[in-house]
Amino acid sequence: MASYSVNDDAVAHARKLIDARQYVLDSDWGDVQPRADAENTFLESHSWDEYAQWHLGLTDGAADETKARYGFVYGDFRRIHRSGLIACHYRAAEWRHKDVELAAHDLLQLLDRKAA
C-alpha cells in the first residue's frame, strides 16, 4: 500500500478557496470528481505545481510531475467541494493515512464554520 504525506501547499490553497467562498456545499462527489480527461485538460494549460494544489496527499517515493505523485483530490480544479473533503477524510481514515485524514478533517471543519 502506498504511503502519503500531507501536501501543505494544497492545504493552504484549500484554505484560500474557503476564505474566498469558492466552494460547493452540495454535490455528488462521484459525479463531479475530476476524471483522467479533466486532469489532462487541466495540465495542458496549468503547471504541475497548480495541479498539485488540488491534492491533499503526496505519494511517498513517487516521481514529481507525475499523476502518481498526487492523491486525495478535493475539488474540481475551480472550487473546493465539501463532498470531496468528506471523500478524502473517509479514504484516508479507511487506509490509515492519519496525517491526510486530519488535514481533510480540519479543512472540513473550517468550511462548515465559514459556510454557516
Where in the sequence are the language-model features?
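A charge-rich, low-complexity, intrinsically flexible signal that marks solvent-exposed coils, linkers
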Residues: 1-116
